[in-house]
Amino acid sequence: MSVVVYAPASIGNVSVGFDVLGAAVSPIDGTLLGDRVKVEAGAEAFTLKTAGRFVDKLPANPQENIVYDCWQVFARELEKKSVVLKPLTMTLEKNMPIGSGLGSSACSIVAALDALNQFHASPLDETELLALMGEMEGKISGSIHYDNVAPCYLGGVQLMLEELGIISQSVPSFDDWYWVMAYPGIKVSTAEARAILPAQYRRQDIVAHGRYLAGFIHACHTQQPELAAKMIKDVIAEPYREKLLPGFAKARNYAASAGALATGISGSGPTLFSVCKEQAVAERVARWLEQNYVQNEEGFVHICRLDKQGSKVTGSEL
C-alpha cells in the first residue's frame, strides 16, 4: 500500500493581504508546479528518499529535512489519539525552488502531512492537519503563518482568520483570471525579506492597507473583478522589498502597459505574479518576463489559473 500526494505552489499575501491572504495556483498546460510526496510501507520506522529537479538544494542529512519534522509531529499527534504509527518510507519529489516566493516549504509540508494522514486512513481532521502545517512552517520561518500552507492544502484563495477554532476560510474568486508566475532563478530568504520591513508604519499606510484589503474581499464576495483587481495594492511590503528584486519595477510597468490587471510580489519574492483577464495578454506578459525578468536557467515563467483543489492524491506511484 502506498499513496502519493501533490501539493501546488501558492502566492503568499497576494499583495493586498500581508500574512493573511494566500492563493494556490497551477499551470494551465498541466505542468506540475509543486512538490509530491510518496508514503509506502517500510522496513524501519522512518526512511527518507529524495528526488526531483531541485533535489540538490535539500539538506544531505535526512533529519534536517522538513519532511522528517513532519513525520515527527504527525507521530506525536497519533500518539495522543492512541493510533499506531506504521513503519514507512517517504519520498520527497522536490520540484519547487527553495526561497522562491512560491510557497516551496509549504508544498513539502502539505504534501508530507497530507500523505502521512492518507496513509494512516485520515486519523487527523482538516483543522488538526492544517494546525500542524502552520507549526512546521513556523519551524522554518520563525513564526507560525498559514498564508502558504492554507491555500496549498485547501486550494483557491484563503483568508487567515485564526478565531473560533477557524484557521482560514475560502474567498470567492475570479475563475477566468490568468496568473502569470515568473521566478527569476535567484533566491530571496524569507528572513531577509522580513528584516527589511519597518517596525512601525505611518497612519496613512495603515488606512490605505485596510481600505485595499477590505475592498478586495468585498469585491470578491460581490463578484466585481475590475474593482478587485484595482485593490491588489501593497503598501506594507512591496515598497521596501522591491529593492531585493532586480527588474521588478520595470516588469510591473511593462505588465501594466501590456494590459495586465495587477502585478505584485509572490510571498517574499523573488517570484512575481501578474493577473491578466485575457490569455493573449497573459502570453504577451509571459514572453516579456521570460526574456527580461528570468536571470538564469533555473528561472521559469508559467501561465496559471487558481488551483481550486489544493493538495490531492495523484495515485500510488511517483
From Swiss-Prot:
Matches recorded under Gene3D superfamilies: 3.30.230.10, GHMP kinase, C-terminal domain
EC number: 2.7.1.39
Pathway: Amino-acid biosynthesis; L-threonine biosynthesis; L-threonine from L-aspartate: step 4/5
InterPro entries given in the database record: GHMP_kinase_C_dom, GHMP_kinase_C_sf, GHMP_kinase_N_dom, GHMP_knse_ATP-bd_CS, Homoserine_kinase, Ribosomal_Su5_D2-typ_SF, Ribsml_uS5_D2-typ_fold_subgr
UniProtKB keywords: Amino-acid biosynthesis, ATP-binding, Cytoplasm, Kinase, Nucleotide-binding, Threonine biosynthesis, Transferase
GO biological process entries: threonine biosynthetic process
Main location: cytoplasm
Residues holding ATP: P97, I98, G99, S100, G101, L102, G103, S104, S105, A106, C107
Catalytic activities: L-homoserine + ATP = O-phospho-L-homoserine + ADP + H(+)
Compartments where found: Cytoplasm
Keyword flag Lipoprotein: no
GO molecular function: ATP binding; homoserine kinase activity
Broadest EC class assigned to this enzyme: transferase
Keyword Amino-acid biosynthesis attributed: yes
The organism's place on the tree of life at top rank: Bacteria
One GO cellular component term: cytoplasm
Function noted in UniProt: Catalyzes the ATP-dependent phosphorylation of L-homoserine to L-homoserine phosphate.
Family: Belongs to the GHMP kinase family. Homoserine kinase subfamily.
The name this protein goes by in its record: Homoserine kinase
UniProt organism field: Vibrio cholerae serotype O1 (strain ATCC 39315 / El Tor Inaba N16961)
Underlying gene: thrB
